[in-house]
Amino acid sequence: MKRVVICICTLIMVCAGCTYSNQGQEQKSEPYSVSTTAVDGYQELLSKLYISDSIDRGFVTKLRQYDVSFGDEAQATQALKEWLGEGTQETVVSEDGRDHVKLTKDQTTAEASVNKNGTWVTLTNQNKRPLVTSYSAFLADSIENKVAISKFNDTIKFSSEVALEKVKKFIEGYQLNFSDYDFVVATVSKESFEAYWPYLKENLVKEGADFTSFEDQAEDLCVISVFPKIGEHRIIDSNTRFGSPEQLNITYGTNFMFAVTESGVIHVDITGVFLPSNIRSEEVEVSYDKAVEMIRNKYQETLLENPVYIEKIQIEYAPLPVQQDGQVYEERRYQPLVAVTVKEEGRFEKFYLNPLNWKEVQ
């Protein structure tokens, strides 16, 4: 039984940071009634299997699939060059048998590329690289309860709203074709970084690494994760993977990461994003009633040692490879999936059901 483990990093940012989202309306029908036992805000589906009362099991909607575009490298490179501004230097390098443009301005390097795995855009201020690196280490250590210095919702000396507008402006330069975005904002103050430094230095010394590059690098930082949406629904994020490595059916999710200081955007990471294009005429009916039936069937075949709680059922889009007559093709299509989040012994996991055949996505 394959499950997608939810990265606690994302969960902490969602809980501790601020989420900016436009909420839409979904078609609903009357929930059906079942004979179950209420247990602390849950109902019992099977022995040791519970479903949250907050889930509308009568929800039903019809959604479309979308063709996929890989993107336009020339357009993406031009947008990146315009963002960097006057004085940007271009260097043509050969990678994977083709020419590729890398951009440099002052201490900032950037590039955009498009391949069979989608559109990639990266930007790094080399002077600020230690700050971004230390943020990642800081977050990881906090998740593992090794430090308790910041909740990643610190008061900083510049406006996170201004940082958010800079990120939105950056994204507007690219023709990504998504309906909307959710933005999750985390902030870490200079003082929190300075309090974390001794712990980081101790760990680096143990690993034989040099702490010198981190000295005097502490400053207020705003980190923004961006989750693209089709209609009202997010696409699968970077914590999700389907298929097998090196196979055509391998599919990774994506979200965008931006790091912003008072001086501006210092780091961008947009990795492997597929662009939705033409809307297909066929409709896909998504029913939470049917999803609950499939969940019940799934766990009927499993001997549960611990209680399992179904916390959330929602719709997410995924750029899955087209399959026909048992064959998998490089062509992809965004299609809606039913994402089921469960909790077992305090650990959150997620698995996906495909409403085209109501099988679990592997």
Indicate where each model-derived feature is located:
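Sec-dependent N-terminal signal peptides of Gram-positive bacterial secreted proteins and lipoproteins
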Residues: 1-24
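Intrinsically disordered regions, especially transient/low-confidence alpha-helical propensity segments
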Residues: 10-12, 80, 117, 355
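A short, surface-exposed interaction/processing loop segment used at functional sites
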Residues: 123-150, 250-286, 349-362
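Segments that shape or occlude catalytic/ligand-binding pockets
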Residues: 166, 170-334, 339-348
